[in-house]
Amino acid sequence: MTIAVLGGAGYIGSHTVKQLLAAGEDVVVLDNLITGHRKAVDPRARFYQGDIRDYHFLSQVFSQEKIDGIVHFAAFSIVPESMKDPLKYFDNNTGGMITLLEAMNQFGIKKIVFSSTAATYGEPKQVPIKETDPQVPTNPYGESKLAMEKIMHWADVAYGLKFVALRYFNVAGAMPDGSIGEDHHPETHIVPIILQVAAGTRTGLQIYGDDYPTKDGTNVRDYVHVVDLADAHILALKYLDAGNKSSAFNIGSAHGFSNLEILNAARKVTGQEIPATMGPRRAGDPSTLIASSEKARDILGWKPNYDDIDKIIETAWNWHENHPEGFGDRN
């Protein structure tokens, strides 16, 4: 199959491109490189630079390539930024989805696996979170992704565009061979921030909030390795290719780790002291997000290979140690 990966120069997208290629698929990457890295794209994939909000761009690519399915990562994803500039998120994320679905419908592309988020659940009433639990986002990022899910549902009803929405939690780690990894500007994810401090490329770590109703007062999150997540997207494509109905799946390890536990695991893996200070809570951050991934395990046959936080951090540390400047393409 020829699979178009939108946002394929980004962190999760670039790992998914590699896994798709390893599975023998033909891969096309579309990315505007606002946050992605050209160097992260496997040279075996055909690359097109452009924006998913640009219908003319999508039409050109879909005319040139015979696309069998789409994996869609192209979105802004920083919660605090979404609180300050919600329209940016609705324009890019939700608006981009509308343009994409219009192009898919025009060119007869009937399958899409979409990167949703645990942020659609908001502050959960129970943990672990199930797919049937209420979706009440506490920030515009989560709201923009929930709107995307709803738009896809009605596009399925009207046009028969089949989708899988993968709702995932905190993603971490890097390709085990160290070829690609996480490199955001600015970096907002706790694992790379901690490892940048360990590597000496960042001066200190601030943990946001130590008064949450958790075991040590810091946020608790479910961590999934980026390669396990990439594999989930491939399984979701196979699920759609088999003619199954549209659905949503949680992808997570089902284990919660607090920010302090992540810090201590990183200290153990790196052998560095990694100084940290406590700061106030960030707006829009739920206290605990842990996934029930039973549905993905039962229906997709998904099983994480990296369910140990030390192993996840080891792969991330291998990337950061060998690439202290990331891809080295940002001034």
UniProtKB/Swiss-Prot annotation:
Keyword Cytoplasm attached: no
Amino-acid positions noted as binding substrate in the UniProt annotation, renumbered to this chain: 117, 141, 170, 189-190, 206-208, 221, 282-285
Entry cofactors: NAD(+)
GO biological process: galactose catabolic process via UDP-galactose, Leloir pathway
GO molecular function: UDP-glucose 4-epimerase activity
Alphabetic keyword roster: Carbohydrate metabolism, Galactose metabolism, Isomerase, NAD
Pathway where it operates: Carbohydrate metabolism; galactose metabolism
Pfam families with a match to the protein in the record: Epimerase
Active site: 141 (proton acceptor)
SUPFAM superfamilies per record: NAD(P)-binding Rossmann-fold domains (SSF51735)
Catalytic reaction annotation: UDP-alpha-D-glucose = UDP-alpha-D-galactose
EC id: 5.1.3.2
Superkingdom of the organism of origin: Bacteria
Annotated NAD(+) binding sites: 11-12, 31-36, 51-52, 73-77, 92, 117, 141, 145, 169
Record-annotated disulphide pairs: none
InterPro entries: Epimerase_deHydtase, NAD(P)-bd_dom_sf, UDP_G4E
PANTHER family: UDP-ARABINOSE 4-EPIMERASE 1, UDP-GLUCOSE 4-EPIMERASE
Family the entry assigns: Belongs to the NAD(P)-dependent epimerase/dehydratase family.
NCBIfam families cross-referenced by the UniProt entry: galE
Record's subunit section: Homodimer.
Official protein name in the record: UDP-glucose 4-epimerase
Name of the gene: galE
